[in-house]
Amino acid sequence: MAFTPSSPPSPAADASQRPSRYPGEDTTPTSRREILGWYAYGIAAEVFAVCGVGSFLPLTLEQLARERGVLKSSHLPCVGPDAPTSSLANGTAPALLRRDGADNDQCVVGLLGLEINTASFAMYTFSLAVLVQALTLISFSALADYENNRKTLLLAFGFIGSATSMLFVFVAPPVFTFGAILVIIGVTCLGSSFVVLNSFLPVLVANDPSIQGASKEADEELHTLNENGQFEPRDSFSERNPEFESQYTPGIGLGSKPSTNATSPELQLSTRISSKGVGLGYCAAVLVQILSIGLLFALSKTSLPKVSGTLPLRFVLLLVGIWWFSFTMVTRRWLRNRPGPPLSTTTTGGHTNKWRVWLRLVGFAWKSLWKTVKIAVQLREVRVFLVAWFLLSDAIATVSGTAILFARTELKMSTTLVGCLSITATLSGMTGAFLWPVVSRRFKLKSSHTIMLCIALFEIIPLYGMLAYIPLFKKWGVIGLQQPWEIFPLAIVHGIVSGGLSSYCRSFFGLLIPPGSEAAFYALYAATDKGSSVIGPAIVGMLIDATGQVRSGFFFIAILIVLPIPLVWMVNAEKGRMEGVAMAERMAKGQESETGEPGEEAEGLLARGA
């Protein structure tokens, strides 16, 4: 894929450019247009993350399989004129607005010689998708740091991912397995593109004109951002916000020298741009979610749902794909290439062995991850917290997928209501990101205590769902997620808790990292996150197959959520900080012989997506 090179900088711009660190580096000052191009991709892809992966893709997969499935006991079709439930609505109720299949029988579909529940099919698909995504993230992380690969990979992932969403409009029930393949490709492209997108951030910040101006004033007061987004001197910022000293500084790899000024202008600007990008992405997701609900409601008034219950859902995914593609085009136009260092290729017979170099970089990425693992297991506090994070991130991913399918198959909620449920959780997540720092300051909670409080509130979700097994509540027909309205308060809890956990776990882990190894350890943090999310959905899928009910997954989820609490309580942050400093000193003594390795910068890329 070829891209038109950006226009050469003007002489005026040359005056403010920093020196190049390697041949071919683009040190053109970052423009507002380029920042908007960076924002544009977040606006593009976050819509697929929230509206696609978080809402309509699980429903579409389940409904596609259901329209090809049969009832386990009678082998009658789950959907259609021969289905046992078709007479309940005299053939007039669209499949979009109700759950098909008998209440006490499960709908199964044949796959690879096995009969699996249609809800399990969706869970297994996402479990496999996350596994492929994790392998891709680690393997491709090293490639994007070189030459024009950064922008090439970003656009490739964006265009391929948006195409998978748009192609769903052609996925009919007879080829429902093709939908699973599209989900795997789409989820992989989504996660990989966000990692590459975040790798642009340190480059944009380093070339920002205000950063260049601030860097010339050495030995002066620390600069901070004013309300107009420019830097101005400010005293004792670290005293106002000491936790910034432990935040991740982009671009630092394993064995690099730690930053002497963690509250530097670069970090402040990076935080500001990143936060705004996340906010714009979520706002775009909510907007498209509202548009999708309107589209679903309008299509429910037509004959399309009678043809296939998935047609309206597939039109929504078409809308999501078009949105992703359109804003990726904006990014293609406005975001500069910002090439990395050239690959040191060798030639054989006049041909450049670039593929051999790429394979070497892939191997280096895995080698770097393994090297970090060996260091991490020597740090007791890091080791314990990573186990806790492994369980916790798996629980978060499992609850999200299970809740959507539970609302659709157990509570018989319409797709429109499920969309409203997703909006509720998204808005609550945005609220939680701002709420938990206030709660933590108000009650003077340590980071570990805030995390444990979030986990305790998170446990409410599966425990409440299990109340329906109590005969008294089951007889009442309410309490224990037996009525659709009951899931909305839990969606608020889920959103608020998730917003707190994502930010506090990351910052708490930053306290334990050996100084100078931030990027490598956050790469391990990201790999732990993605790798763990394979297990939970697969186990819940097996429970659904065994029992025929999505509700049975609440037992596993309840155990999974509570397990990290004692582990987080066991982590001593101060001891972990001292262990990290001691490890950094030991690493520094043996680092000199390892400097200059070609992939030194590559370790940081995966971390930027954490």
From Swiss-Prot:
Record field: compositional bias (Acidic residues): 594-603
Region (Disordered): 1-29, 229-265, 588-610
Membrane topology: Multi-pass membrane protein
Gene Ontology process terms (BP): amino acid transmembrane export from vacuole; autophagy
CDD domains per the UniProt record, alphabetical: MFS_Atg22_like (cd17483)
Principal location class: membrane
Tree of life domain: Eukaryota
Alphabetized UniProt keyword annotations: Amino-acid transport, Autophagy, Glycoprotein, Membrane, Transmembrane, Transmembrane helix, Transport, Vacuole
Ranges of Pro residues composition bias in the record: 1-11
GO CC entries: vacuolar membrane
Locations listed in the record: Vacuole membrane
The keyword Transport appears for this protein: yes
Glycosylation site residues: 90, 261
Secretion signal span: none
Residue spans crossing the bilayer: 35-55, 120-140, 152-171, 189-209, 278-298, 310-330, 384-404, 418-438, 453-473, 488-510, 522-544, 553-573
Amino acid composition bias (Basic and acidic residues), ranges on this chain: 232-243
Family of the protein in this entry: Belongs to the ATG22 family.
Function: Vacuolar effluxer which mediate the efflux of amino acids resulting from autophagic degradation. The release of autophagic amino acids allows the maintenance of protein synthesis and viability during nitrogen starvation.
Protein name: Autophagy-related protein 22-1
Gene: atg22-1
